[in-house]
Amino acid sequence: MPSSPSLLHKALIVCFIAFSIPAFVQNKADEKKQIAVQMENAMVNNLLKPWYPASIDTLDGGFLSSFSYDFKPTGNQDKMIVTQARHTWSNSKAAELFPNVPYYRAGAEHGFKFLRDVMWDKQYGGFFTFVDRKGNPKKGGFSPKEAYGNAFAIYALAAYYQMSGDTSALNLAIKEFRWLDKHSHDPIYKGYFQHMQRDGTPIHRDAKTPINAELGYKDQNTSIHVLEALNELYTVWPNPLLKERLSEMLYLIRDTIVTPKGYLNLFFHDDWTPVDFSDSTDAAIMKHKELNHVSFGHDVETAYLMLEASHTLGIKNDTKTLMIGKKMLDHALDNGYDNSVGGFYDEGYYFKDKPGMTILEDTKNWWAQAEGMNTFLIMDKYFPNDPHHYFDKFKQLWNYTQTYLIDSVHGDWYAQGIDKQPQYKTMLKGQIWKGTYHNFRAFMNCIQTLEPDTIAPPIPTDLKLDKSTASLNWTPSPSNKFTGYNIYADGMRIGYTPLTRYDLPKNIKGKTLTITAIDMHGNESEFSNKVYLAR
């Protein structure tokens, strides 16, 4: 048996490896660390601090939505389910990232109570789309119930449970999933109907529906955010029907909604035939362009959401989803990106009588740039030598964001890049469609990709079965970061809790039970000791 190398020999090997690493690799690693520091500072001090706790409505519940450019509350403060859910989600995630900052956890609980007590329709179920500041339902140009908004409610409730362990939040998320699946899911053609009456009846198009109205169509935006919501819920509630619907949405988006060229069709008839005006005159196309254009921001966002769902579903070697996601980013980069200063344009179109892509709107909204940075880094991880030079594009887009989107004086991001629309310097910072969700999520994901935390929490110990209460109890994982626990029965994941007690379902008998510790980045420990629940 060969002897172990000496300490000097080991040191020489380490030195040789270090000096053998090309300078550009070291420089790239240094750049990543530097940008991660910049992003964390921007995330905490420029984004989260201006919003929280200032946006908490201590008078009427929920969150204030409308803020002026210098972060003063303005307007009537009507409340939309999407905004309220997103703020609840952001506070839940911030509480995991920064457990020593008490107002994030308090803000998440505050948001959950508003969703539960005000936005939930106690008569018919489901969440109202739009209410006034005091919680009275309003039309506001929306359908009474919408799948998009109800999906974000699931998203928020699952995140709040993941952070808090409040089972009433998980139960409401499950109740909402079942309500949405009963009323909005299409059992024939799959997917979900977006528009619903208050009682959950889907609204279909008829002869009176204006031709340029979204009402009654299925759409990509609802679909990708239903996917996202089901993904979030599945991480804490691994239910078979939920898994089936999550898989269904992934394959529907990837294989039907994404076109062969690599962009999303936007609106659809019930059978997923696209709403398409490309055979019409240019004037007709422009009249209906809100229903039929290329949205580069949604394309780069969807590339990420598909990969996230594939990972959550545990699909091994899913090269098909990866390559379609890459195609979507490449298409947006080749056709809808400003190579001179950076930034994804808002809208493009393929006219049949014109070569290539025509840019309809060369403006650059804030959320597309946030999503773009995240997806650039994902593709750089998988394809570091790709001729698109994803990391260089990421750096350019981050520089663009710092220069033309981030308001270093008053906080947060402008709604549109001021290289194209300087008037946005003094326009609203917050409104029902603009909170912290897109850029906060992008910051979290980018920082984790730039400086990956790949260390799993320590294994939880002393797992015990309390037969009198049919519950598991254990000693927590001694980790200095937020840690939750996955529950397994005969090797299959059956649940999650951030607490150190889990009440077992009634059907879990005759099973061997064990747990793992898992952090917010998905790093999971080895299994704990095992216990057996007899029949």
Segments the model singles out, each with a brief description of its role:
Residues 492-499:
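Short beta-strand segments within Ig-like beta-sandwich modules, predominantly Fibronectin type-III
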Residues 451-480, 520-535:
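Pro/Thr/Ser/Gly-rich low-complexity, intrinsically disordered linker/stalk tracts
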Residues 504-524:
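Beta-strand-rich modules
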Residues 477-490:
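Solvent-exposed loop/turn segments flanking beta-strands in beta-repeat/beta-sandwich domains
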Residues 26-468, 487:
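Glycan-recognition and catalytic cores of secretory/periplasmic carbohydrate-active enzymes
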Residues 1-29:
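Bacterial Sec-dependent N-terminal signal peptides
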Residues 460, 474, 487, 504, ...:
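An aromatic-rich alpha-helical recognition segment common to small helix-rich domains
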Residues 189-191, 467-471, 499-503, 510:
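A generic structural signal for beta-strand entry/edge sites
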